[in-house]
């Protein structure tokens, strides 16, 4: 009996000395906003659904906040990281904010400039109402580019530009007849094409370099949470690589259907093909695209101070350089 007691005491002593088995660290919770609902948000959805964020020790909550408000939420410290366009980063920086683009997920201006079925030619928009997105947002600039290309000048031609929320709201405004035209992403535009609405201009075919969306954070947050930001970026980059592998098409299409609420196979196929056709294999910010953003914002009177900025002032390429130098990008190709 004494021998058994001593054995138990010895085991307890060893357990105390060596400590209990280490428990897995709790994942870091983080809120990640996206400023639009379109197929280029898919890398975020896939990273969450396929466990890539979890792989890097993150518990990510994805939340939709319309782009301009998402940028404001970051500046207010309410949201640490978001997927928004370089237009909003430009506005923040020229107002004294410290937002910066660290990944590039959509590096071109790809919108359908849509009109109601009653509009047969662009000239018929004179004196009519056109919906734009948030002030200085990518959809707004796409509208200005489309009007320029079609030879229309809002002030001269009495075209009323109305700031109408996100894409679902602009689509709804077109259907309701409260506006005659609007810029929509191709996946939403295709819905209206099937209903008889007209594509007056496909800006994607014009190949306009443009940083439409990217992963954005404040420089102060990056400085105080470098590993969290890097892990988040790694998860998204793996999401991009997953999407671009043909073997994963069925999973990606199901995810698009669920998140975009698309149920028709032809629309899903077009959304998928557009995504894999434009999603960069190495999702880094496009310096040419950012330069184009700055130029267009000045040209259309959206932010005169943008003329004083260089692309390097609103972009941080350090993570992309690290991923390139370490072979992380190459390992996923």
Map each language-model feature to its residues:
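N-terminal secretory signal peptides that target proteins for export/translocation
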Residues: 1-4
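Bacterial N-terminal signal peptides
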Residues: 8-19
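Sec/Tat signal peptide C-region and signal peptidase I cleavage site
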Residues: 20-24
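Short, glycine-/small- and polar/acidic-enriched structural segments
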Residues: 25-166, 170-176, 180-186, 199-203, ...
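Pocket-lining segment of extracytoplasmic ligand-binding domains
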Residues: 87-88, 168-260
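Secondary-structure end/capping motifs
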Residues: 223-306
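Conserved C-terminal helix/tail region of periplasmic/extracytoplasmic solute-binding proteins
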Residues: 294-333
């Amino acid at each position: 009996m004494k021998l058994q007691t001593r054995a138990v005491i010895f085991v307890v002593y060893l357990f105390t000395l060596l400590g209990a088995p280490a428990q897995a660290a709790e994942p870091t919770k983080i809120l990640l906003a996206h400023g639009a609902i379109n197929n280029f948000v898919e890398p975020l959805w896939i990273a969450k659904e396929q466990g890539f964020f979890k792989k890097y020790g993150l518990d990510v909550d994805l939340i939709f906040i319309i782009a301009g408000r998402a940028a404001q939420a970051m500046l207010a410290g309410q949201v640490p990281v978001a997927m928004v366009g370089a237009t909003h980063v430009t506005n923040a920086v020229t107002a004294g904010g410290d937002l910066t683009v660290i990944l590039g997920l959509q590096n071109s201006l790809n919108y359908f400039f849509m009109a109601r079925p009653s509009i047969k030619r662009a000239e018929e928009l004179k004196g009519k109402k056109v919906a734009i997105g948030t002030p200085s947002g990518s959809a707004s600039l796409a509208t200005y580019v489309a009007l320029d290309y079609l030879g229309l000048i809002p002030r001269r031609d009495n075209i009323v530009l109305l700031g109408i929320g996100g894409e679902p709201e602009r689509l709804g405004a077109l259907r309701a007849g409260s506006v005659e035209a609007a810029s929509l992403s191709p996946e939403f535009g295709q819905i209206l094409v099937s209903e008889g609405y007209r594509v007056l201009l496909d800006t994607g075919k014009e190949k306009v370099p443009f940083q439409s969306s990217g992963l954005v954070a404040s420089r102060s947050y990056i400085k105080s949470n470098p590993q969290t930001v890097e892990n988040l970026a790694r998860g998204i980059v793996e999401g991009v690589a997953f999407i671009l592998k043909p073997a994963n098409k069925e999973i990606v299409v199901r995810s698009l259907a669920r998140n975009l609420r698309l149920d028709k196979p032809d629309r899903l196929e077009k959304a998928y093909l557009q995504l894999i056709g434009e999603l960069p294999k190495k999702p880094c910010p496009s310096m040419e695209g950012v330069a184009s953003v700055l130029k267009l914002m000045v040209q259309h009177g959206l932010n005169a101070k943008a003329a004083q900025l260089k692309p390097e002032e609103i972009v941080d390429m350090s993570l992309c350089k690290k991923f390139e130098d370490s072979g992380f990008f190459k390992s996923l190709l």
